[in-house]
Amino acid sequence: PSPMTNSTIAASNWGFPTVIRFGPGRIAELAEACLSLGMKNPLLVTDPGVVNLPMISDAVAANNAAGLPTAVFSDIQGNPVGSDVERGLNVLRSGNHDGVIVFGGGSAMDAGKTIAFMAGQTLSMFDFEDRGDNWTHADPNGILPIVAVPTTSGTGSEVGRATVIIDEADHTKKILFHPQMLPGIVIEDPELTIGLPASITAWTGMDALAHCLE
């Protein structure tokens, strides 16, 4: 018999279906990626540390030139809180946006993915905390498509089905989960990391190393 026959290792299912477009200059494909997911009026979610960099204005200008008007939301904290998401939802709904571009590091990814997830939900955000079968209570038709454009190497949130948001009611970090929170397309353009401050490059590099050690 196999030495693994009596093993206590649990069986599990794994899936990594995200389409990843990797390579220098791939950011030029952003508009096409959005259109391929059915977006016509996306909201770009980023963070205050990135919003004023040329990469954001260049991406918005390229989208506009491609006939894809793109608004920007960046009013989020380094560790996103529930009220950040609520503000983003207000912008999303008032602008009738039909998809979300998450552009930046982990905070932008978590906030933007949650905004896309909550777009058409009727329950409150933390009703979908990753406990039991909470995720099954979400309306899958109320989740908007997501294109992820990571600018750091640390979090890996661009290929994840979950986000971490701080619940201000009890000051705890909570994980929200749904299979459709996974971005439809990821654009991994290493040139976008060049314009980041050295400190962020170092911090996120250590984050990536910590993930490997884990």
Name each model-derived stretch.
Residues 1-73:
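An N-terminal, well-structured beta->alpha segment
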Residues 6-8, 28-32, 86-89, 131-135, ...:
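A generic local structural motif
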Residues 22-25, 29, 37, 54, ...:
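Conserved active-site and cofactor/substrate-binding residues in soluble primary-metabolism enzymes
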Residues 43-44, 99-101, 147:
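Conserved beta-strand elements of the Class I
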Residues 51-125:
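N-terminal small/polar loop signature for handling phosphorylated ligands or for N-terminal nucleophile
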Residues 120-214:
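A glycine/threonine-rich phosphate-anchoring loop and its flanking beta-alpha core
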